[in-house]
Amino acid sequence: WAIETKQFYLMEGTNLNEVSQKLQKIAWNLESDGGLVLDFSESWHRKVGNFFIKRDSLIEYKKICWSKGMLHHDDVLFLSLKILEKNNRIIDILRAKFPYIMIDEFQDTSLIQSKIIKQIAEKETIIGVIGDECQSIYEFAGASVDEFINFHLDGIRLFKIEENNRSTVEIINVLNHVSKDSKLNQFSPDKRGGDTPKILIGGIHKAYKYAKDVVGESPLLTLAYRKDNPNKLKYGVKSIDNEALKLNLLFEDDDRGRKIYYVIQSIEYGKEGRIKDALKSMLKAYRKDLTFKERESLKNLQTLLNEYSNIENLSLTDFYNSFLFGHFNTHQKITRGKRKEFYSSVFYKDIACTVDLHETNSLFRTIHKSKGDEEQNVLLVIENKKSFDEIKELKFLLNPSINADEDHRVYFVALSRAKEKLFINIPSLSEENKIEIEKLNLFVIDYLE
């Protein structure tokens, strides 16, 4: 693609990784005149090093992907709209087959999806949409909260459900504060009271232990914006840049690093019961070994899963030398040099943290994966790092603007999962903001030693 579009500067070694990440951010957008354009969601995403990706080259990238049978969900929507625009008969067939269409979670609908729905609704088919503007959290996937707020069809009727049968009065009060600029004000029909939500000041591991001690045997759902925070708690890993470690493996040590990463990914998928995905990852790990087929993939996965208790606490050096070296044409040990120093300082669990699991039953999840769920007790972990920006990260409490700021809606989703007890963890709190939070009369603030 870079060669065909004469963007040779993108092929420099230091740029390859960044280009790969940036291309994942392109999406089809609906313009005000109804036309479709392929572009980055943010203009700065075009920048790679000191250069910019040409906008008119993006369609060429898509064509290459399509020629290889690679379709993104976004492409499916784009092509669906194109098909409907070229053949009105298809819309007639859809109307005849679906006289009634009910769409849940409509606040997460993209502009393209909304346009398709409006075309179908022009006659015959009756459309019903259900949603909550406060829970529109998929802007990165093309969703627009304004599209939901302003959605209109001829003869539309509006119904509101303001009763909250899930949470205590104390938690509902927090939700109403965070969502105060929306049109929805919730209440508890049975006025069920409970504990005042707590803000825990300190590290995530201390906060988790504190919350677990409070809830006892009752389940504690731990949520965070980024997947590495709940994963670090799940695996007992301290604060390190796990994503940087992952990229180091994939791009700095060629085949060996990739093999280690994809084998670990395979094992973690296997633990989750996603055997099909686990086998795909194992095949990726040994892709250059032409004798390594699905049978070998399954055999290796089974062996490594059986050894999990012996693997999970190893450094990457020990994991590689003990369980990968000597098997399936892996001939070279890690014995010396800078790579040995690196692999000896990184542990299996550090990399396991980066594997994007789809666990729906896990008590350690990202906020986005908790949509639609509920739990007795919830611990929300706010970005917990040395560069913690208190003003930015606490704005959803100190100066909420839920319609304008998607981050505030994401945190609203997390808070609204809680039924009985709610904890919010932040690493630090200034005296000034402590006073402002106390004025809200919504939280108890606890400093963890």
Placement of each model-derived feature along the sequence:
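The feature marks helicase ATPase cores and/or their adjacent C-terminal helical subdomains
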Residues: 1-449
